[in-house]
Design a protein with these regions (language model features):
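Conserved beta-strand hairpin/beta-sheet module of binuclear metal-dependent hydrolase folds
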Residues: 1-33, 120-134
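Active-site environment of divalent metal-dependent phosphoester hydrolases
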Residues: 2, 23-25, 45-52, 65-68, ...
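Structural recognition of the beta-strand scaffold that forms the well-ordered cores
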Residues: 7, 15-17, 41-44, 59-60, ...
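Active-site metal-binding motif and surrounding structural segment of the metallo-beta-lactamase
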Residues: 13, 23-65, 162
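Soluble non-cytosolic domains of exported or imported proteins
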Residues: 20-27, 98, 146-150, 197-198
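Metallo-beta-lactamase
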Residues: 21-22, 67-184, 188-190
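Accessory terminal helices/loops
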Residues: 161-166, 173-229
Length: 229
């Protein structure tokens, strides 16, 4: 799996967004960062990997803590632990600072926290960027039913309205607002295809016909399970 970690640096001080979760990556990234002062880590959707920089202050919303400790994030951690075995660091970061919606400054860098259903997104005004969990303009996403699709659409439309130059995600290369518009169209189409499908298998077949070149078949499998639970 591709898990992205972002390092926002200003004047020799850095803030980490998300944590790596494989032991070898934990060590490699810690070595890479050894000459920087790390002011803190924002732990949103990827709570595993607690052996990575355990001494650094950890920031998260209350719902993100619940997501990683007992919610959908915990279920994913358990699944990854079973799939990857001893190479996967399933320990969950202990959050030292519970944060809420709105602006917060860490290490001299301003962030704006936007709470989502599972955890939170992070706006970074100084570089006109936003971090969210998943986008992927040519990749399936995990969509937990029509209401979740609508929530993602509203979220992405908000980013388009705000005019962000860069959208950073955990599972894809950096993208832009054209990619957000593409994902909105995809989500609208998913809802239509689900409404006209008799079951999960029909739905997956219809989506694959519409988007034959999309990656992330495992995400589509999960989405089908949510739409036809």
């Amino acid at each position: 799996i591709d898990n992205e970690v972002f390092i926002v640096e200003k004047d020799g001080v850095a803030v980490i967004i998300e944590s790596p979760c494989f032991f070898d990556n934990n060590q490699e990234l810690a070595e890479y960062l050894q000459d920087l002062e790390i002011a803190g880590m924002l732990v949103a959707y990827h709570g595993a990997g607690a052996t990575f920089m355990p001494e650094v202050a950890k920031y998260a919303t209350a719902n993100a803590v619940a997501y990683s400790q007992s919610g959908g994030g915990k279920a994913l951690i358990d699944n990854f632990s079973n799939a990857f075995g001893a190479s996967f660091d399933s320990s969950v970061h202990q959050i030292t600072h519970i944060i809420g919606e709105g602006p917060i400054t860490i290490g001299g860098i301003e962030f704006i926290i936007r709470q989502t259903a599972d955890a939170f997104d992070i706006e970074i005004p100084q570089i006109n960027a936003v971090y969210t969990h998943m986008l992927g303009h040519d990749c399936h996403s995990i969509v937990a039913g029509p209401a979740h699709a609508d929530a993602i659409i509203a979220q992405l439309q908000g980013y388009i309205t705000q005019g962000y130059d860069l959208i950073l995600t955990s599972h894809y290369t950096p993208e832009d607002l054209k990619d957000a518009a593409t994902k909105i169209a995809y989500l609208e189409e998913l809802k239509k295809l689900a409404a006209h499908s008799a079951n999960a298998e029909d739905f997956k077949a219809a989506v694959n016909r519409q988007y034959p070149d999309y990656s992330g078949a495992n995400y589509l499998e999960m989405t089908a399970g949510f739409f036809f639970a």
